[in-house]
Amino acid sequence: MQHTHYLKLSKLLITGKLCYTTNDDIYHAMCNVHLNKSLMEQDIRVICQQISQLSWIKGISVRKQWPNVLKIYIIEYEPICYWNDVQMLDKDGVIFQVPIDRINDKYCLPILYGPEGSALDVLTGYRVLYDVIKSTGFTLRSVKMNHRYSWQIILKENIKLELGRKNKVERLQRFIKAYPFFIKNIQNDGRCINYIDLRYDYGFAVSWMTCSNYSDCENIE
């Protein structure tokens, strides 16, 4: 009669709020772990290290259940926005990546852009701008900070705003205040807004785009 101490591991029980993780992910991550060993011979530390290599895994709890079950509890990062199109950020500015075919576009997350190492700065800037705009009826679609610390945002209405390096909140507020009067006076002449440049002490400039992609610029005080 075989002693239970030597029974091979026969079951992995994987639980947690899993949006991106599949059972196959866990099995593949553990390919270097000798699953044909007994439960008591399994090294929990090594198992955690293997699974942690999955970019979207935030935390893992592994427990042994007698006589031959390994219980794995997974905590995933929760994205609040996309980062440079191909990655994601959580609320703490942690960058992670999920297989593209598992990303559900119905969440319509905003997209943030920035140089390497700037994720937390851009996320902080996004939150500041979001607080300004959240009660106005506009929606932030993307926020970008370039290597010169100059800010650009695109609204869900496909309006691009150049905010520049400083006073981005005041400049955004200027646009919000002027927009109802500005849009009211736009004639339906086949033109659409290319972008609005708010990098002025007063007023802003509007770049128009026509069907032939010709752009001209009009200053509005």
Segments from the language model and where they lie:
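Charged, solvent-exposed interaction patches on well-folded alpha/beta domains
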Residues: M1-L13, T21-L39, I44-Q49, Q53, ...
